[in-house]
């Protein structure tokens, strides 16, 4: 159905899919890896990129990324937007390189696992903590991919 809806997109329109497991007031609604939907979603959906949650164990491992077709990018949501504590940069970099076993590094990106305020209530982070998360993402991305 999604492919039918976006079939006539303009050439310069970039379409992405975000797989969200819930992001209400620093809580989540569902869990489970991407394996059950990987072949259909990553192999057949006609989008340009996927924004995927990988901020904790409830997202499963990176193996389903092997199903991502060669014309798509994957944005790894490795930095949580649910908790204020900053992740260890070395741990995040190691996870990026682990994901690169399935999707080439040049087709990977880094982001928070979701937005900071998917609903009016937002998550339990101050504005300062949110900016610190964004700075962390930027710093790690510069180390891994350069400019």
Where are these regions (language model features)?
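Domain-level signal for soluble alpha/beta catalytic cores
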Residues: 1-147
């Amino acid at each position: 159905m999604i492919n039918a809806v976006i079939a006539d997109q303009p050439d310069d329109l970039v379409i992405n899919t975000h797989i969200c497991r819930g992001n209400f007031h620093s809580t989540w609604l569902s869990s489970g890896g991407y394996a059950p939907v990987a072949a259909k979603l990553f192999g057949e959906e006609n989008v340009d990129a996927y924004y995927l949650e990988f901020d904790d164990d409830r997202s499963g491992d990176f193996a389903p990324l092997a199903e991502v077709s060669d014309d798509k990018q994957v944005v790894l949501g490795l930095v949580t937007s649910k908790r204020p504590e900053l992740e260890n940069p070395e741990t995040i970099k190691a996870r990026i390189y682990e994901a690169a076993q399935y999707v080439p590094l040049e087709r990977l990106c880094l982001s928070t696992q979701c937005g900071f305020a998917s609903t009016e209530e937002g998550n339990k982070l101050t504005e300062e903590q949110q900016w610190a998360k964004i700075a962390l993402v930027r710093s790690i991305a510069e180390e891994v991919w350069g400019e």
